[in-house]
Each structure stands twice: as C-alpha cells, then as structure tokens.
Amino acid sequence: MALRFPRFSQGLAQDPTTRRIWFGIATAHDFESHDDITEERLYQNIFASHFGQLAIIFLWTSGNLFHVAWQGNFESWVQDPLHVRPIAHTIWDPHFGQPAVEAFTRGGALGPVNIAYSGVYQWWYTIGLRTNEDLYTGALFLLFISAISLVGGWLHLQPKWKPSVSWFKNAESRLNHHLSGLFGVSSLAWAGHLVHVAIPGSRGEYVRWNNFLDVLPYPQGLGPLFTGQWNLYAQNPDSSSHLFGTSQGAGTAILTLLGGFHPQTQSLWLTDIAHHHLAIAFIFLVAGHMYRTNFGIGHSIKDLLEAHIPPGGRLGRGHKGLYDTINNSIHFQLGLALASLGVITSLVAQHMYSLPAYAFIAQDFTTQAALYTHHQYIAGFIMTGAFAHGAIFFIRDYNPQQNEDNVLARMLDHKEAIISHLSWASLFLGFHTLGLYVHNDVMLAFGTPEKQILIEPIFAQWIQSAHGKTSYGFDVLLSSTNGPAFNAGQSLWLPGWLNAINENRNSLFLTIGPGDFLVHHAIALGLHTTTLILVKGALDARGSKLMPDKKDFGYSFPCDGPGRGGTCDISAWDAFYLAVFWMLNTIGWVTFYWHWKHITLWQGNVSQFNESSTYLMGWLRDYLWLNSSQLINGYNPFGMNSLSVWAWMFLFGHLVWATGFMFLISWRGYWQELIETLAWAHERTPLANLIRWRDKPVALSIVQARLVGLAHFSVGYIFTYAAFLIASTSGKFG
C-alpha cells in the first residue's frame, strides 16, 4: 500500500474517513506526537524550520523593496514626502473599467496603483535610501540572504551537520551568542549604519560603497574617541531650522541626547537614535560575556536559580528545580518567548505613534493608524499563544517531583486564590464601567446630559504632569518650573523633551478627561477577563476539582462522555479558544479609542471625542456610524471611487465574520446528517456518481469546528476593522 497522508502518523493514515485529512493538517506541526520522533529529531526539526522562517521573512521584505523600486514612486516621494502619496505597487485587474482605472490612478502613476500605508517609504528614507537603485540593491541583497537561510536549513538536516541535543540544551552558550552575537553586534552595526550613512544622508550627503571610506561622519573622525573627549560627538547638533535631507541648518553632532522631535519631520532626532543603538549595543555586548562556558568564569544559570530562595520562606524553595524544568521543556521556552515578544509588540504599537522614529511618518495619519492597529492585533495573538504553550507545558512536561514547593508548584497550589481574585477584579471593573456608561447613556437619552457621572482621571493627569505636562496646572516635578529636575532638563539632558510634551503637534501625553477614564477602565476589564480565562486554562490544565485527571486527556478534548456529567468545554484548549474572543474584543476597544481620539485630534475637533465618548450611543453614533459613511459610499450613483475596494472589503469582512457563527453555534450531529444526505444524493445522481472519493465524509469534530469558527470570526473581524480604519482615515486625510 502506498504511503498516504499523513506520513508522520501511520495510525491516522489508515483512518478510512475524511478525519484523516483534517487531523493530519491539525497535527502536522505537533512534532512531539509524530511516529518515530526522538528528542534529537524534535530539536533538529524545529531548528531547521527556523531557517525556513527566516528565508520567508527575507523573501517578503525583498519583495517589498523590489515592487516599490519597480512600480512605486519612491524617487518623486523623496522630493516631497508630505504631498506625494507613496505607491506600494500597481494593480493589474482585467475587470477594471474606465471609472475604476481613473479612481485608482493616483500618486503620479500612469495606471491603477495601491497606496502604501505600511510606513516603508518613511523608513527607507530615514535610513538613507534615496533612489530606486538603492531599493533594487537592497532587494537583491535580501534575496541572497533568503537563499543562504534556505541552504542553512537544509544543511542542518544533513547527518554531518545535525547539532546534538546537548548543543541545544547549552543555555549559557546560547545566551552569550544571542545577547552578544545577535543583539549586541546587530545593534552596533545599526548604530554604525546610522552614523555613517543615515545621518550624513539627512544632511544632504549621499554615502554609498564608492565613497564610504572618504566621507567622515564627524569632522574630527575617531580623534575624540581615543582622546576621551566623547562629549565632542554631541556638540553642534542639527538646528531647529534644519531641513531634513539637506545641509540647510544641519550640524555635525553624531551622538546626542536632545530629546523631543525634529521640528520639520516630527520624528525623533537621528543623532539621538544612533546614540540609543550604540548604548544598547554596549549593554548587550557586555551581557553576552556574563555566562559561564568554556573558561570556567561567569554565571551558571543553574547555580543562579538554585540560589534564588527568598528569605523568610515566603516562596518555599524559590527557583529550585526550575533550570531543568525550563531547559527540558520546549513549550515552557516557547511560552516565555511568546510572552516577551507579545509585550514588545504591544510596546512597539504604543511607541511608534507617540515617539515616531521615521521622518514624516507622524504626518501620514493613515499609516499611523494602520501600524498601531496592526501591532496591537499581532501582540494579542502572540500573548494568547504564550498561555496556550504554558498550558501544554503543564500537561506534557511538568514533573511535580522535580518542582516540589518551588514557585511553579506554589502557583498551582494557590490557583484558587489567583483565579478568584482575577474573577473579582473582572466583575468589579465590568459592572462599574458598564454601569457608568449605561447611566450616562440614559441621561443623554432623557435629555439631561448634565446628570452624567463624569470622573476626571486626576491620578493619570498627575503622572503626566510629573513628566512635564503643564496644562493641568499641577506644578509638580518636571512641570514645576522652579524645580531642580526642570532646570537640569533645560541643558543637561533631553532639553527638547519638555517642549515636545507641551506642544500640540504630536501624540505625547495627550490631554485626558472623563471619556478616557471610562474607556481605560473598559480596556482594563477586557485585559483582566482575557487574563483570567488564560490563567485559569493554564493552571487548571492538569486537573481541577471537577476533573482531577484532566492531564491524561491531553491539551484539547471535547468531553469525557455522559458518565462524568459536565466535563465538556473544560480542556486547556477551550480556555484558549474563549480567550481569543475576549482578546479580539479588548483590542477592538483599544483601537476604537486610539483611532477616535486621534481622528478628532488631527481634525482639530477634540471636543467631539471628549463630549461623545462618555456614553454608549456616542461611541456607536459619533465614532462607528459617522466614520463608516466612507465605506457605504464606495459605490454610489456617480460610479465608484478610490475607496471602493475598502467598501467591498468591509462587506466581505462582515461575511467572513458571520460565517464563523455557522461553525460556532451548531452541533456535530446536524452536520453529520447533512453530509450523509448529500453523499446519498450524490451517489444516486447520474454523471455525479461517476466521481467517488476514498475517504468516507464525516463532520468535523467539536474542537475542529470551533477552530474553524474561531478562524473565520478572527479573520472577518480584523478584515472588517482594517477596511473601516483605512477608508475612514484616508477618506479624510488622503
């Protein structure tokens, strides 16, 4: 018999039903469950797949560069970044009639094009790229790196080049390599690029390989470095009248601590950014030499963890046993990595708009909105994944004997207290926030807006004041003009910071009021509820009072039959499944808030947000309904316009989202009966019955149907909001 899919599971390959296909796809990446898997092969497969991942990333970025160079308008955008619309690529569509061709021909293009809302133009411009040739060179280089990555992945699966398990479990060497080799060296290289190419580029000096060694980024070269006069590198920074990309108003400094933004580009000073990367490089290069490898000096992670026993016995045996637990569990390591990456991605979202690093990106409002929303959604998925793999760790890898009375065991011992406290916090936030919104809503409906309960966020305003925001009149710390910190800030450190906080042309420390207070608590409710579901799923993954032997059933199981009464929907997978809905819900509130506040800020009618955000109808009418007008105007009696594609995507997103409910609010028997009826009809229909299939069609399992439903719900939800966001923002601001 020929080998059937899936080859990694002979048991599944012999399944006579369509379950073979779906279960095969579902477990393709669960290497641990495959036939003939060994620990060594498991590590090697994962290691090789990392190279494939890198190859895809480099190919994708290469494609961005290539298509902009080939079909974009980078060179004309560089001449006038504020008024030329950046083109991502052309659109070739045989269905386009003349109105469509006219609607999508913009940005100085000859035919229909897509506008870039990803910020790549601003990024490439800031780092010193100026011509299409530069973009082609970058694309070719990344293509080369992509090919090298593929070869690397293949190579590390060959017998001679397969690393051993001990190599994968050498934590100290890996830490040193990642800290120094990846973070340290790459940050140093980036600081070097900024100093040698980007900063001269911002001052009108075009540095390439042919003149790289002739152009000194600083007049005195390395002199100040070797004579210890490092402060010279910060002297004579660009002036406030500097025109980016020209020598007009340019200085000579390369490493500064100015703070604030370049007045023309409204982005961080390039010299500040270079300084930051140099500092990061220094820290990580040092950190990468701290762990004990060949020479018997430095820290041993195991020794560090074994020594971490808090005095007073409050945390039992502290970190004892953690080293082997973490080092031998890929799921634990992945959970930690995902948790860190998720937090970082959310921080990227917050900082890309409040402290924009790329020239002119702050004035490209649609790009700002798209990047914020994109990074928050990515962060949500990554963070929920962290808890999913934490739960799998508890089911597959956790050994109670190895972890007796350490912090992990104590988390499990205290899980009732942890879960009930989170539950209490969620209930408190939910009822109080909704209560305030509903009360205010009713007051507005009855025509007595003055009876709303409006709470000023005085503590948050005080924190903003402490950082230098003067408009609240708190007169504290950095907002107190006669305090020592304020005076030192004028000259010693970040003199531009206080100006930036107090001018209205950026998104630093936006003025907040009762509407912000309410929506912050709504978001807090979402965060706490999502966390509650995820934490409970992980802590109850091994067992609960209702089902003490849960771990024997694995990560995802539908029920344990009627005999156990009520064991449905309590697998760790079900907790993840439920949490994703809450995560999407929460990020919906976060992005609604961010977008509405910024739209009113950019349009100069902040009072609309302030007045309408304190009650539910305000959000529904003045944010969602008012801003969706562009989406229902994509096609009208006058034909179509450049928003038509978003209008179509808005409808399509709703369709995909609604399809999700077909899988979510349904039972397996219904589908099985329907499938059998269809199969019966098929087999009795002339011509149709000439086509036979090998596998008996069966309905999806309960867990699979939930996954399919969740996938449609998530994709439709994000498509719908993406279309709304881009159309409503670009419709107003271009």
Curated annotation (Swiss-Prot):
It is found in: Plastid, Chloroplast thylakoid membrane. InterPro entries: PSI_PsaA/B (IPR001280), PSI_PsaA/B_CS (IPR020586), PSI_PsaA/B_sf (IPR036408), PSI_PsaB (IPR006244). It comes from the Eukaryota. P700 is a chlorophyll a/chlorophyll a' dimer, A0 is one or more chlorophyll a, A1 is one or both phylloquinones and FX is a shared 4Fe-4S iron-sulfur center. Its main location: plastid. The chain crosses the membrane at residues 46-69, 135-158, 175-199, 273-291, 330-353, 369-395, 417-439, 517-535, 575-596, 643-665, 707-727. Pfam families: PsaA_PsaB. Chlorophyll a B1 binds at residue 654. GO terms for molecular function: 4 iron, 4 sulfur cluster binding; chlorophyll binding; electron transfer activity; magnesium ion binding; oxidoreductase activity. [4Fe-4S] cluster binds at residues 559, 568. One of its GO terms (biological process) is photosynthesis. It catalyses: reduced [plastocyanin] + hnu + oxidized [2Fe-2S]-[ferredoxin] = oxidized [plastocyanin] + reduced [2Fe-2S]-[ferredoxin]. It is an enzyme of class 1 (oxidoreductase). Phylloquinone binds at residue 671. Keywords: 4Fe-4S, Chlorophyll, Chloroplast, Chromophore, Electron transport, Iron, Iron-sulfur, Magnesium, Membrane, Metal-binding, Oxidoreductase, Photosynthesis, Photosystem I, Plastid, Thylakoid, Transmembrane, Transmembrane helix, Transport. Its EC number is 1.97.1.12. Chlorophyll a B3 binds at residues 662, 670. GO terms for cellular component: chloroplast thylakoid membrane; photosystem I. It is a multi-pass membrane protein. PsaA and PsaB bind P700, the primary electron donor of photosystem I (PSI), as well as the electron acceptors A0, A1 and FX. PSI is a plastocyanin-ferredoxin oxidoreductase, converting photonic excitation into a charge separation, which transfers an electron from the donor P700 chlorophyll pair to the spectroscopically characterized acceptors A0, A1, FX, FA and FB in turn. Oxidized P700 is reduced on the lumenal side of the thylakoid membrane by plastocyanin. NCBIfam families: psaB. The PsaA/B heterodimer binds the P700 chlorophyll special pair and subsequent electron acceptors. PSI consists of a core antenna complex that captures photons, and an electron transfer chain that converts photonic excitation into a charge separation. The eukaryotic PSI reaction center is composed of at least 11 subunits. Belongs to the PsaA/PsaB family. This is Photosystem I P700 chlorophyll a apoprotein A2.
